Amino acid sequence: MEYRKLQGTDLTVSAVGFGVWTVGTTWWGVKDEQLGKRLLRQAFERGVTLFDNADTYASGRAEELQREALHDVRDQIVVATKFGYDIVNHPERPGQQERPHDWSPQYMRRALEASLRRLGTDRIDYYQLHNPRLDAIEQGSALADDLFAELEQAKAEGLIRAYGTALGPALNERQIEEGVASLRRGAPTQIIYNLLEQVLGEPVLAEAERLQVGVLARVPHASGLLEGYMTADTTFEPGDHRNWRLTTNERRKAWMEDGLKKVEQLQPFLEGRSIGQLALQFALHSPLMASLIPNIYDEQGLISYTSLDDARPLSDDEYGQIQALYAQNFGLNTSLIGEVVR
């Protein structure tokens, strides 16, 4: 496992992290909590140190699950979680709809105390605003300035070691402005980024390079398109979040077909590596990309993603060839990539 500095903080993280939402919710088909805890433990044993959680995942149960799996190695891992959605006054909504945000300093404190309790720890290593809009980030916004001042105070008290933002849930150009605003505060940002979805990559990573503030990326496998198992006939279980993120079965099928046509053109790059490993190597190309947070929901994926040292390295020439394919939209006239909200 490779380890990288999360620039702008004192944290060092595994280049491949673990997004606990895949095992802490039922949105990815892992309904067995014992399996979820085994995967978390196996990830640690295979060198993963960054575990990315959120208080909204199963209304806090995902944080408890992480504690149960990893409490005895707490000081050997980087505990990252998120806040901002009002899970106290607004229960989960059908169809995984967003809950209202509360960015008041008082709510942040309340959320922080609850996460500390559920995670069984005295500090959060990396505390992130969960899907904020620009008014909760930008300098000069009273809402944001008050919130970030309180985050600084919590840091001074030792309750958090570092803070940042996790942007979403939809992938759109609005997040370029949000990501840049976060970096300009000296706060790392987590974005959706993969070789099929690079809307945020170039502008956000360029600003990260200029400011020397780090970036994390989730969904490096484009919601499954780059995992190697999808076909045009793939269907998702009823609780799978991808059923909610595209409005109709026809749109979902079109999204898959569009993505799979692009994936087919990546076959020449698969000598000595799987498609899933290629996706991770590509997204880690920038030195400011501290860690990737793939969706891990079975042992096969876990082993593959934590075995990058065994895969043939991605050369600069190969990286450039893939970028050239992306620049011409893989020769296709239409694109539905980016429609899935994550």
Question: What are the residue ranges of the model-derived segments?
Answer:
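N-terminal binding-site loop/beta-alpha segment at the start of enzyme catalytic domains
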Residues: 1-81
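Acidic (Asp/Glu)-rich catalytic clusters
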Residues: 8-10, 68-75, 117-120, 153-155, ...
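Short, acidic/polar
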Residues: 30-43, 104-118, 171-179
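Active-site groove signature of glycoside hydrolases
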Residues: 114-137
